[in-house]
Every structure is written in C-alpha cells, then in structure tokens.
Amino acid sequence: MSYAIIETGGKQLKVQPGRFYDIELLHVDPETSHTIDKVLLVSHDNEVTVGQPFVEGATVEGTILRHFRGRKVIVYKMRPKKKTRKKRGHRQEITRFMVNAINFNGQVIGATENGTTTPTTANVEVATTEGSDSEE
C-alpha cells in the first residue's frame, strides 16, 4: 500500500491512488488533470521518505472531478440584554480531487489501472424472472 501526505489549502491530507478527496477550491477546470508538488511524506513498500519540509522529486497526479459548495455553517452572535443579534451563514467552496498516481523521482510508485475513474460492469449479473415458476 503506497500513500502520500500532501499539503493543499493550508491543510495536510493523506492520499492514496484510486480514491477521491474533497479539498479547498482549486481554480482549475473540471475534468482536467492537476499535479500537486507539495508532498510532505511518501510511503511505499514499508519504505518511508520524509521531506524537510517537502520531498524532492515527489508529485501527486490527479483529476479534478467537480467543484461544489459544502454544507452551510450558521454563525449566530447575540449580546444578552441588548437587542443585538447577528445571524450569518457560510458555505465553503470545495473541489473533488481524484488521485491517479503518486510519483517519486520519476517513477510511478502508486497508480490506478489506466487512470480511469468509471466503474466497470463486467461482473454484474442480471437477475431475470421466468413465467409462472412457483414452488410446489
């Protein structure tokens, strides 16, 4: 199992190939590839490389799936015994980021199969019902 710890949007996040993550807004068009080079740690086959502060030559490649807004957070301020009340809401802009590969010194150490994100339907069985077969 290979993983990396990246920094994006002022936060640190543990990422693995083949998974998607909701991160702070990236000003990149959806359905395009994006590379993050702020990699703090890379782990592959029980071998851990820690950067100071970043790992040289390590990148995380992925695809921007979509942009959306998070859940609304209500901020309510009230001063007791006064008629002062403030109610405000905030919705954070979020980007859904699919990790395709983790690269380290020019080698791909973790990647998804073909970099695709669509599920396959090869193993799906369709159940059909036949006429009037009933248990006797």
From Swiss-Prot:
Transmembrane segments: none annotated. GO terms for molecular function: rRNA binding; structural constituent of ribosome. Coiled coil: none annotated. One of its GO terms (cellular component) is ribonucleoprotein complex. Pfam families: Ribosomal_L21p. One of its GO terms (biological process) is translation. The keyword Amino-acid biosynthesis does not apply. The keyword Ribonucleoprotein applies. Keywords: Ribonucleoprotein, Ribosomal protein, RNA-binding, rRNA-binding. InterPro entries: bL21-like, bL21-like_sf, Ribosomal_bL21, Ribosomal_bL21_CS. This protein binds to 23S rRNA in the presence of protein L20. Part of the 50S ribosomal subunit. Contacts protein L20. Belongs to the bacterial ribosomal protein bL21 family. This is Large ribosomal subunit protein bL21. It comes from Gloeothece citriformis (strain PCC 7424). The gene is rplU.
